[in-house]
From Swiss-Prot:
Multidrug efflux pump. Belongs to the multi antimicrobial extrusion (MATE) (TC 2.A.66.1) family. Pfam families: MatE. This is Probable multidrug resistance protein NorM. It comes from the Bacteria. It is a multi-pass membrane protein. GO terms for molecular function: antiporter activity; transmembrane transporter activity; xenobiotic transmembrane transporter activity. It is found in: Cell membrane. The chain crosses the membrane at residues 23-43, 53-73, 101-121, 132-152, 169-189, 194-214, 243-263, 277-297, 316-336, 355-375, 391-411, 422-442. One of its GO terms (cellular component) is membrane. Keywords: Antiport, Cell membrane, Ion transport, Membrane, Transmembrane, Transmembrane helix, Transport. It comes from Deinococcus radiodurans (strain ATCC 13939 / DSM 20539 / JCM 16871 / CCUG 27074 / LMG 4051 / NBRC 15346 / NCIMB 9279 / VKM B-1422 / R1).
Length: 451
């Protein structure tokens, strides 16, 4: 019976290597989340009309944008495998191909977003300003190219084991948005009051600044490997690897979006409780998301170097770390739900008593939900390190849309569990995805198989 050679470094050493990568990535994830929070806070101060218009436009924009982001996530594993193999030319080609792919995707998506700005407002619900939706979408979409380029540059630094530079740049973007968003929205000093368009412009300009700052750092990290030649093959390879990632992210995001729409049937209080619970989970999810990115880099680096046993260990360490973190978060949430919810809502207001009660019930289900969510995102990251993306897509489609939404709808409507039934469905879908993807990773890294 064929066995894998022993891993080259211990589990403890692998954990240290993973933490060195994951720490800066997690901070960068929180910084990206902070940009969205800043925009929401500024728009909220502009008024209810502006907030509703931005929410409506973002719902359409991000449904498309998240899939394009998924395509760009192919850069990091390509870089990691080339870096692990000592292929400096491969690293440089992955970066060059990634930037060209960002340009091509933007050339397709920007006209689409511009056209959408004329069509989408016609379907806006009552009370949502069509003019504000159109203006926001046109200005906000100007940040698409730098955002995609930033992902390619970030993937290069992460893939070569130097994600720390990304943290400083991301925090710079947060500071910029913190200063510029209110200045443009409210017209500080000599600046004109641009309202919602100003807040959107601040977000777009932050993306351009971050991409510009990260470019020399990523370029310095890539050793000169001579003329790279035509990059068409590399762009195609990145797209082949990335499109299943994009559809996987779209499938997961779509499951949550449809669940939110179904939750609206149970009234505004239950819908608000659902949103508060999801906000809580999303905040904690930034940590396993960073661990997943770092795990993908570690697996890709070791697989590229031909060390399959070490790649397997890297993936298992990442899965263990992610599970431990999410289990800790679940204990905190179950022990002190009111404290957790106080970040998002006034828990002492008697008017919110029903909301808090419903959200606490959802959070009790979310304990397992979070554990499985951390497992699936980390397993997905490990499989991306092996450049395995098509089977995870099929798993995600079945887990999220057949089991997650299908079972949730049955439990909610037929079994009479109401809103909790939808949460049980989400948890079942994530459980199937998590366990299946872990099994896929173990299969891909077993003895006798090439990474």
């Amino acid at each position: 019976m064929t066995t894998l050679p022993a891993p080259t470094i211990s589990t403890t050493a692998e954990l240290r290597a993973l933490l060195r990568l994951a720490g800066p990535v997690v901070v960068s994830q929180f910084a990206a989340n902070a940009l969205a929070l800043i925009a929401t806070a500024v728009i909220g101060r502009l008024g209810e009309r502006e907030l509703a218009a931005a929410a409506y436009a973002n719902a359409a924009y991000y449904l498309v944008f998240i899939m394009v982001v998924g395509v760009m996530l192919s850069v990091a594993p390509r870089v990691a495998q080339a870096h692990g193999a000592g292929d400096a030319r491969g690293v440089a080609r992955a970066l060059g191909g990634g930037l060209r792919l960002a340009l091509l995707l933007s050339a397709v998506m920007l006209p689409l977003m511009w056209a959408l700005s004329f069509v989408l407002p016609n379907f806006a619900p009552a009370g949502v300003s069509r003019d504000l939706v159109a203006a926001y979408l046109r200005v906000y979409s100007l940040g698409m190219l730098p955002n995609l380029a930033f992902i390619a540059l970030r993937g290069t630094l992460e893939g070569t084991g130097k994600p720390g530079a990304v943290t400083g740049v991301a925090l710079t973007g947060v500071v910029w948005a913190l200063l510029v968003a209110p200045a443009l929205a409210f017209g500080w000093g000599p600046l004109p009051r641009l309202g919602l368009a100003g807040a959107a412009g601040a977000s777009a300009s932050a993306a351009w600044i971050m991409a510009a700052l990260l470019w020399p750092l990523a370029r310095r990290r890539v050793a000169y490997a001579g003329p790279l030649g035509p990059l068409g093959d590399e762009v195609r390879a990145l797209f082949r690897l990335g499109w299943p990632i994009g559809l996987t992210l779209g499938a997961e995001g779509g499951m949550f979006s449809v669940t939110t729409l179904l939750m609206a049937r149970f009234g505004p209080e239950v819908l608000a409780a659902h949103n508060v619970t999801m906000q809580t989970i999303t905040a904690f999810f930034m940590v396993p998301l960073g661990i997943a990115s770092a795990t993908g880099v570690r697996v890709g680096t070791e697989a590229g170097a031909g060390r399959l046993a070490q790649a397997r260990r890297a993936g298992l360490v990442g899965l263990g770390l992610s599970s431990a973190v999410m289990l800790t978060f679940a204990v905190i949430e179950l022990a002190a739900p009111r404290t957790v919810f106080s970040v998002f809502v006034n828990v002492n207001d008697p008017a919110n008593a029903g909301l808090i009660a419903a959200a606490t019930g959802f959070l009790s289900i979310a304990a397992l939900f979070q554990l499985m969510d951390g497992l699936q995102v980390t397993a997905n990251g490990a499989l991306r390190g092996l450049q395995d993306t098509r089977v995870p897509l099929l798993v995600s489609l079945v887990a999220y849309w057949v089991v997650g939404l299908g079972l949730g709808s049955v439990l909610s409507s037929v079994a009479g569990l109401g809103a909790r039934g939808l949460w049980f469905g989400l948890t079942a879908g994530l459980t199937l995805a998590g366990l299946s993807l872990v099994g896929r990773f173990l299969y891909r890294t077993r003895a006798g198989r090439a990474a």
